[in-house]
Design a protein with these regions (language model features):
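Active-site beta->alpha N-cap acidic-glycine motif
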Residues: 31-117, 123, 127-130, 134, ...
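N-terminal pre-catalytic segment of deacetylase/amide-hydrolase enzymes
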Residues: 1-55, 62-77, 91-94, 222-226, ...
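A short acidic, helix-capping loop that chelates divalent metal ions and anchors anionic groups
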Residues: 114-119, 207-211
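Catalytic grooves of carbohydrate-active enzymes
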Residues: 191-239
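Short, well-ordered coil/turn segments that N-cap beta-strands
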Residues: 50-53, 76-80, 102-104, 140-144, ...
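His/Asp/Glu-enriched short active-site or ligand-binding loop at hydrolase and phosphoryl-transfer sites
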Residues: 152, 158-194, 233-244
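Charged helix-capping and loop-helix junction motifs
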Residues: 97, 121-128, 183-188, 214-221
Length: 248
């Protein structure tokens, strides 16, 4: 069959267009995917088989729900990892101090929670440093853990993070608790994904406003800990889970 040259050109252009769309789609997915590793290594859990769960809470400190959550964790003798928004840590250093005094790990979640995929490098650096200063002002020395807001990153983001001496932390299970209709909804979302060695993302606050209602998250956390402790799981902090990687 004779194919005219202009048809060949059209086919080639179509192929390039499809490939371009696929590449952009893949890059977009990887920029937000919690377990994606294209833009740099980030810890998001252990291999299957480890009966450990690391509970992590973003967007605090928040009154009264962070304090209520601390009571639940203390009741079960569980320690967790909290990624704090710097402006809230500066607003309520007393709650940040309560987190630290109860033996939990505190990490950096930027100062105002911007989407880092659309921020210039200078603003990314400033957000991280301002958050670090706010947390240090509240509790003093704290961990070098960092979680990007919404998990968003792009090429170069993790380079800046590591230049500042921070370790990027993502997750592989979430309770979708930012707009959950009930505690049962959160519990079901988490339970469907738990496989052992998981980093669970929950929220004790909200980037949108201080004082957000996270009572459902507090209730779900209570139930999840009871459920998985009964099944023989250990609840650990992110640093404790990461040490397991160096041992295994």
């Amino acid at each position: 069959m004779h194919v005219f040259p202009n048809a060949l050109i059209q086919f080639a252009m179509l192929g390039f267009a499809i490939a371009g769309v696929a590449a952009v789609t893949a890059l977009g997915y990887q920029s937000m995917a919690p377990t994606g590793q294209w833009f740099g290594r980030a810890f998001c859990g252990l291999p299957l088989g480890s009966k450990q769960i690391a509970l992590t809470f973003d967007d605090g400190p928040n009154d009264p729900h962070t304090l209520n959550l601390l009571e639940v964790l203390a009741k079960h003798n569980v320690h967790a990892t909290f990624f704090l928004i710097g402006k809230y840590a500066r607003q309520r250093p007393d709650i940040a101090q309560a987190i630290a005094k109860n033996g939990h790990v505190i990490g950096n979640h930027t100062f105002t929670h911007p989407l880092l995929t659309v921020q210039p490098n200078s603003r990314i650096r400033r957000q991280i440093l301002d958050c670090r200063n706010a947390i240090t002002g509240a509790v003093g020395e704290h961990s070098n853990l960092f979680r990007p807001p919404w998990g968003g990153r792009r090429p170069g983001t993790f380079r800046i993070i590591r230049e500042l001496g921070l370790e990027p932390i993502m997750w592989n299970v979430t309770g979708y608790d930012w707009n959950a209709p009930s505690a049962e909804f959160i519990e079901q979302k988490v339970s469907r994904k738990i496989r052992a060695g998981d980093v669970v993302l929950l929220h004790d606050g909200s980037h949108a406003a201080f004082g957000a209602d996270r009572s459902k998250t507090v209730q779900a956390t209570d139930r999840l800990i009871a459920k998985y402790k009964n099944e023989g799981y250990d609840f650990v902090t992110i640093p404790e889970m990461m040490r397991r990687v160096t041992i295994v």
